[in-house]
Amino acid sequence: MSRRLFTSESVTEGHPDKLADQISDALLDAFLAGDPTSRVAVETLLTTGHVHVAGEVTSSAHVDVTAVVRRTLTDIGYDAATGFDGATVGVLVSIGAQSPDIAQGVDKAYEARVEGGEDTLAQQGAGDQGIMFGYATDETPDLLPLPITLAHRLAQRLSKVRHDGLLPYLRPDGKTQVTIEYDGDRPVRLDTVVVSAHHAADVDLATRLVPDIRDQVIAPELKRLAEENLGLEVDGYRLLVNPTGRFEIGGPIGDAGLTGRKIIIDTYGGYARHGGGAFSGKDPSKVDRSAAYALRWVAKNVVAAGLARRAELQVAYAIGKAEPVGLFVETFGTETVPVPEIARAVSEVFDLRPAAIIRDLDLLRPIYGQTASYGHFGRTLPDFTWERTDRADALRAAVGR
């Protein structure tokens, strides 16, 4: 089979764009905690000395936006030593109400307004038009592509050794990148790891940072991979640490951060398609978020059911309409039953109307802050209901297996 290289990247919680995502989702959680029916669309911009929060919110909850912003920044580790102090940074808030034109389509769907439908799950329309994708593959236990899985693990480890004090000279910002060699569609060899680690002054790259990153960040994760018996060759991989030579200036004083600029990191690392809609700061009435979560759930169950080794699904919505306007299933030749049968089974087992997604995945909860770094998919945390494989048996039954 043909051999090829594929690369995915991740970033730490202290990366400027991820700061923006985490602030937006912390605010979403705060509104949902006070009012589970809150409609929230919040964007965050960070730059030197300033945080600007803007968007639309309709909620009965009262939220101290500035306090949430400061707490998020300081919890991540932004203090005076980093040059961007969460306790003193300027916070500007520009939040209005959701447009009534949008609200009327969400509150009373096309099916109810025009067709007179009485099904309670048909009462809520999609919060916008758009296309969403979900993907799963059997190449890792998490049913996520290996490059993004390892990139996330390394980024999370980079933050952990900082928080735990193992590498106290590290600062919050950072990036990881992993290149894997594939033989056909199977990962076989680790080719390259890139780590960019934000650090204090007077840290020598060659004698301190590179050995520490290799021993404290990468080695534990390679050991974890070995324990998962993936058969990945890791000897002789290329390691690049801070290839510019220094990374003392980081966070929002090095680069501005903005909500929604890491959508490929948030999903499948470029291995699967993306509809273009960001997740963070959006309540689940926005199908950009809820339908993407639902399709990850569907794809994961298709693979767990043994109907295909790889599955990618697309769904499309019209604003204000409950029923999707389209569903597409792709299995890349790995299916064990005909693709039309898989598509029929998916439609039979899963209800992809917005209200049904919200009900089935229990999305009206303040759970979103933990999604905003290290990937929305691939982590089997208790609140990540879209990572369950609880409908694999139903899918098998639907195709007669």
Curated annotation (Swiss-Prot):
UniProt xrefs under PROSITE patterns: ADOMET_SYNTHASE_1, ADOMET_SYNTHASE_2
Q: What is its main location?
A: cytoplasm
Instruction: State the Gene Ontology BP annotations.
Output: one-carbon metabolic process; S-adenosylmethionine biosynthetic process
Leading EC class: transferase
Q: How is the cofactor bound?
A: Binds 2 divalent ions per subunit. Binds 1 potassium ion per subunit.
Q: What is its EC number?
A: 2.5.1.6
One cellular component term from this protein's GO annotations in UniProt: cytoplasm
- Give all cystine bridges in this chain: none
Residues given in the record as K(+) binding sites: E43
The residues listed in the UniProt record as binding L-methionine, with positions renumbered to this chain, are E56, Q98, D255, K286
Pfam families found in the cross-reference section: S-AdoMet_synt_C (PF02773), S-AdoMet_synt_M (PF02772), S-AdoMet_synt_N (PF00438)
Subcellular localization is given as: Cytoplasm
In terms of SUPFAM superfamilies, this protein maps to:
S-adenosylmethionine synthetase
Sorted alphabetically, the keyword list is: ATP-binding, Cytoplasm, Magnesium, Metal-binding, Nucleotide-binding, One-carbon metabolism, Potassium, Transferase
What metabolic or biological pathway is this protein involved in? Amino-acid biosynthesis; S-adenosyl-L-methionine biosynthesis; S-adenosyl-L-methionine from L-methionine: step 1/1
For this protein, what reaction is catalysed? Answer: L-methionine + ATP + H2O = S-adenosyl-L-methionine + phosphate + diphosphate
InterPro entries documented for this protein: ADOMET_SYNTHASE_CS (IPR022631), S-AdoMet_synt_C (IPR022630), S-AdoMet_synt_central (IPR022629), S-AdoMet_synt_N (IPR022628), S-AdoMet_synthetase (IPR002133), S-AdoMet_synthetase_sfam (IPR022636)
Per UniProt, ATP binds at: H15, D173, G174, K175, R246, F247, D255, R261, K262, A278, K282
Q: Where does Mg(2+) bind?
A: D17
Known role: Catalyzes the formation of S-adenosylmethionine (AdoMet) from methionine and ATP. The overall synthetic reaction is composed of two sequential steps, AdoMet formation and the subsequent tripolyphosphate hydrolysis which occurs prior to release of AdoMet from the enzyme.
Subunit structure comment from the entry: Homotetramer; dimer of dimers.
Q: Which family does it belong to?
A: Belongs to the AdoMet synthase family.
Protein name, as recorded: S-adenosylmethionine synthase 1
Highest lineage ranks of the organism? Answer: Bacteria, Bacillati, Actinomycetota, Actinomycetes, Frankiales
